[in-house]
């Protein structure tokens, strides 16, 4: 949807003092949603009892399998965030 909007309206200028592209800001915002910290024993308890993956997995899993993320951040092929073999749902 964002890319379609950009095509129709043009690319917005970057925010002053922010040295990230709009694509990078998109992924940064996604990651920040899942940002948090907890004590190791609480994390282990949550992993054992919750049906949902912990925040870091919700970020690293999808983004490391995203070609768009790898392009936005210029991740080297074969790196942790741009593995050569990716899992694709669609």
Task: Give residue ranges: language-model regions.
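Zinc-dependent metallohydrolase catalytic domains
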Residues: 1-90
């Amino acid at each position: 949807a964002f890319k379609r909007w950009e095509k129709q309206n043009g690319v917005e200028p970057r925010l002053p003092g922010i040295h990230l592209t709009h694509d990078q800001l998109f992924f940064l915002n996604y990651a920040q949603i899942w940002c948090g910290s907890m004590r190791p024993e609480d994390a282990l308890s949550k992993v054992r009892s919750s049906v949902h993956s912990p925040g870091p997995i919700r970020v690293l899993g999808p983004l490391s399998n995203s070609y768009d993320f790898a392009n936005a951040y210029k991740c080297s092929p074969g790196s942790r965030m741009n593995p050569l073999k990716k899992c694709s749902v669609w």
